[in-house]
Amino acid sequence: VPANSEGISYGRKEDKMGWNCQPTRTITFENVKVDAGNLIGNEGDGFKLAMKGLDGGRINIATCSLGAAQAALDTAQRYMLERKQFGKAIGDFQGLQFKLADMLTNLVAARQMVRMAAVKLDQKDPEASVYSAMAKRFATDVGFNVCNDALQIHGGYGYIREYPLERYVRDSRVHQILEGTNEIMRLIIARRALLEGATEIIQ
C-alpha cells in the first residue's frame, strides 16, 4: 500500500526507552482503497501470509540481539584489560573472569541456535516455526543478559551515557518483546513439545 494513499494517517512519534534510531508511529487506515495490482497472493490470504513472515522476523530480531551482545562483550573485554583496581587489571579477578566466560559461552550457544533456525527456515522444514521461536526466545534473553552483565562489569561508568553500555541495555530490552513476546515464544514451543513424538523430532 503506497504510504501516501488517501485515508492513511500517522500518529505522533513515540518517545521510546531505546531503539531511537528508527521512528515508531501508529498508522491508521480509514476507507483506504488499494489497487488490485498491489494485491500479494489471493484475496483473504493476508493474515496467513503475515503469519508466515513472523518466523523470519523472529530470526531477524534474534540476530539484532546477537549483534548488540557482541558489541557489549567486546567493550567489556577491553575494559577488563584496561581498568586497574588494587594494582592490577580487573580482568585478573576470578569473579569477573567467570562472568566473562559465561557471557561468551552463552553468546556462542545463542548464535548457533539462530543459525540452526535460519537453516530450518531456508529448507522449509516443517518444524521451522518452533525452531524460530526457540532461537528468538533464547537469543534475545541471552542478548539482554550479556548487555546487562557488560554494564555491571563497568560499574558506575556503565550507567553513564559517555559509555555505550546503557544504550546497548536499553536497545536490547525490546528484543524480548518484538515479533512476539518471549512468553508467547514459550507457549509456541510448549504446545509443540506436548504433541506426540515432539521431543524426538525437535533436537
Residue ranges and their predicted role:
Residues 13-16, 39-54, 79-93, 117, ...:
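Conserved catalytic-core motifs characterized by acidic clusters
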Residues 66, 70-73, 107-114, 143-147:
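Hydrophobic faces of stable alpha-helices that mediate helix-helix packing
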